[in-house]
């Protein structure tokens, strides 16, 4: 499995991410996004499921979600503020991609973050969204 590594230690990302974190590609329709992954068991297990095609559903005008084919390890935290571009695991098998920022009391396991999430809201224009994740 080939994974790309970001070489920009000065990027404005979550400090819990390593200096040279692993990244994966995410495609919604013909738009490609880069997702920087957290260094945790859930993110590592997620990479092992790639390539992965999901039909994600819109919910609450701030997220899209889909059940994964297999459970992933979870270590949920209460982030308080969810940021647009956060890729999280809800429970052990539901992948959630947030396209709007808001306050939340829910608990999630962080998987990663879309590096430039500005175009995500425009991609969520229907109830069911095809999303593909690749490790290269």
Regions found by a protein language model. Name each.
Residues 7-10:
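Boundary of Sec targeting at the N-terminus
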Residues 50-136:
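Glycine-rich active-site loops that engage anionic ligands at enzyme catalytic sites
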């Amino acid at each position: 499995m080939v994974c790309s590594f970001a070489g920009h230690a000065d990027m404005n990302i979550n400090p819990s991410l390593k200096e040279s974190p692993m990244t994966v590609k995410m495609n919604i329709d013909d738009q490609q996004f880069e997702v920087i992954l957290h260094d945790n068991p859930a993110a590592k297990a997620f990479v092992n499921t790639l390539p992965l095609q999901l039909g994600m559903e819109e919910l609450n005008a701030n997220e899209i979600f889909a059940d994964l084919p297999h459970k992933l390890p979870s270590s949920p935290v209460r982030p308080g503020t969810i940021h647009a571009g956060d890729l999280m695991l809800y429970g052990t098998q539901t992948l959630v991609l947030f396209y709007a920022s808001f306050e939340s009391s829910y608990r999630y396991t962080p998987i990663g973050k879309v590096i430039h999430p500005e175009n995500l809201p425009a991609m969520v224009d229907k109830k069911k969204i095809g999303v593909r994740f690749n490790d290269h």
